[in-house]
């Protein structure tokens, strides 16, 4: 029987920052948040912090976001390794073209034992889940049979790697959209804010909304000055959304 893969989001990389020693400036932050402030101050050479309201890093970054000077957010980035996400969800995810992606290849990785991601609305209903897993099992069985026959048909291909790749790329056509995939996603702070604003909305598909909420939680930990204006709230149906009055790029 098909196994259900739980969503897992792991932060694997984030920006480090080293201030130039010849610039007369310091800040109370580090990493990406410090880089954002440095980039903003570099535009105006305001190293002496003339405005008390923006003297702290948090105050400065909040002002940057409030006035819409979003370009300085593009200097800092975060990378996530995401597993337990369905192929159908990554088809939506990769529409965010300011991100960079590296995704599991079904041409090189066999899917005999692939897990599936149960859609919201099915995952908590035993009868629906049984129908779902039976369909997933049928798809995987068809994949395995096609793969075996295709490899036999391509036996004259002397290059074993090419033979396996050609068989897999044809057989994968019967795998369900719910098949689990794994993907590395890198984006700058501006791109992540846009993603959260678009996909943590109640109007987004629930699977990608869950992904956006989990990414947001880790982004707040990594750079609270940049992401803590988003508020996560629970709706009447028990699902979560995130909104911010400063999220104007949608």
Curated annotation (Swiss-Prot):
SS bond partners: none
Pfam families, per the entry: Thy1
Residues covered by the ThyX domain: 7-233
Cofactor note: Binds 4 FAD per tetramer. Each FAD binding site is formed by three monomers.
Keyword list, A-Z: FAD, Flavoprotein, Methyltransferase, NADP, Nucleotide biosynthesis, Transferase
Catalytic EC class: transferase
Cofactor(s) named in the record: FAD
Active site: 199 (involved in ionization of n3 of dump, leading to its activation)
Listed InterPro entries: Thymidylate_synthase_ThyX, Thymidylate_synthase_ThyX_sf
Family as reported in the entry's similarity comment: Belongs to the thymidylate synthase ThyX family.
NCBIfam families: thyX
Role played: Catalyzes the reductive methylation of 2'-deoxyuridine-5'-monophosphate (dUMP) to 2'-deoxythymidine-5'-monophosphate (dTMP) while utilizing 5,10-methylenetetrahydrofolate (mTHF) as the methyl donor, and NADPH and FADH(2) as the reductant.
Protein name: Flavin-dependent thymidylate synthase
Biological source species: Mycolicibacterium vanbaalenii (strain DSM 7251 / JCM 13017 / BCRC 16820 / KCTC 9966 / NRRL B-24157 / PYR-1) (Mycobacterium vanbaalenii)
This protein's encoding gene: thyX
């Amino acid at each position: 029987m098909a196994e259900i893969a739980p969503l897992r989001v792991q932060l694997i990389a984030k920006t480090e920052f080293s201030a130039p020693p010849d610039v007369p400036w310091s800040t109370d932050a580090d990493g990406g948040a410090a880089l954002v402030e440095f980039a903003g101050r570099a535009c105006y050479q305001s190293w002496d912090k003339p405005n008390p309201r923006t003297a702290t890093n948090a105050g400065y970054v909040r002002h940057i976001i409030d006035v819409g000077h979003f370009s300085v957010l593009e200097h800092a980035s975060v990378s996530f390794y995401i597993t337990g996400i369905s192929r159908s969800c990554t088809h939506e995810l990769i529409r965010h073209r300011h991100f960079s992606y590296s995704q599991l290849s079904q041409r090189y990785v066999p899917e005999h034992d692939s897990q599936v991601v149960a859609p919201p609305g099915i995952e908590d209903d035993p009868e629906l889940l049984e129908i779902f897993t039976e369909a997933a099992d049928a798809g995987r069985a068809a994949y395995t049979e096609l793969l075996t026959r295709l490899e036999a048909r391509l036996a004259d291909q002397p290059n074993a790697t090419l033979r396996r790749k050609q068989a897999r790329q044809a057989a994968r056509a019967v795998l369900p959209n719910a098949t689990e995939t794994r993907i590395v996603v890198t984006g700058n702070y501006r791109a992540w804010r846009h993603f959260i604003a678009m996909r943590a909305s109640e109007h987004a598909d629930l699977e990608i909304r869950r992904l956006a909420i989990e990414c947001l939680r880790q982004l707040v930990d990594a750079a609270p000055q940049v992401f803590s204006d988003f508020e996560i709230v629970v709706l009447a149906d028990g699902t979560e959304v995130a909104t911010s009055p400063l999220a104007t790029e949608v």
